[in-house]
Regions:
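Membrane-interface helix-loop junctions and terminal tails of multi-pass membrane proteins
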Residues: 1-213
Length: 213
């Protein structure tokens, strides 16, 4: 239970930071979001692994680092609950809803590729700095993971909306739609892209680890 509580809390503060910075129109939103992820990773890494992202949980599961499918589903449910609660908290505190969406001039294919590639980068960094036995005990893993999101959000956010996380996509989109602010049109994008990216990262990590002691 403590793992699921930690995943809920970490995902909540990640998505709450997304909501408050995006609705305020802050040009430094990517830095705030990456920093939020970093500090939540240091908060919960020793308890749950600090995934806060169904795509990362999938990658960790595919590498055999989760006990069961049931545990994977527990992580995902906790992450989605945290994201939905954060989107509601954003509405209560900021008076606005928000939702990621592709840029006006971006094609669906371009947005999908951005979500795949930067989620791949995120999950691969997580696997190498927070899962690999060769880097156990390091103190930089939170910084590396958080700044992967900073890079992805600045570089790819204008194209895809910069979720790189099904929870970051789902919670805000559901609340935004429920409040009459939009539709579920792009919801699939923030599941398919990140999950493909996470699965690819698991495969590449396996190749990186192959034959190493």
């Amino acid at each position: 239970m403590r793992k699921y509580l930690t995943e809920f809390i970490g995902t909540f503060f990640l998505v709450f930071t997304v909501g408050l910075t995006v609705t305020a129109g802050s040009p430094m939103a990517p830095l705030a979001i990456g920093s939020s992820l970093m500090i939540m990773i240091y908060m919960g890494g020793h308890i749950s692994g600090a995934h806060y992202n169904p795509a990362v949980s999938l990658a960790v599961f595919l590498r055999g680092r989760m006990a069961s499918v049931g545990e994977l589903l527990g992580y995902i449910v906790s992450q989605l609950a945290g994201a939905i609660t954060a989107a509601l908290a954003t509405y209560v505190t900021a008076g606005k809803t928000f939702a990621p969406a592709p840029g006006d001039s971006a094609s669906v294919l371009a947005a999908l590729l951005i979500e795949i590639l930067f989620t791949f980068a995120l999950a691969l960094v997580v696997l190498n700095v927070a899962v690999s036995a060769k880097t156990q005990g390091n103190s930089f893993y939170g910084l590396a993971i958080g700044f992967t999101i900073v890079v992805g959000a600045f570089a790819g956010g204008p194209i895809s909306g910069g979720a790189f996380n099904p929870a970051v996509g789902t919670g805000p989109i559901l609340v935004h739609a429920a409040m009459g602010g939009g539709t579920l049109t792009h919801l699939w994008l923030y599941w398919v892209g990140p999950l493909v990216g996470g699965a690819l990262a698991a495969g590449v990590f396996g190749l990186q680890e192959a034959g190493t002691a």
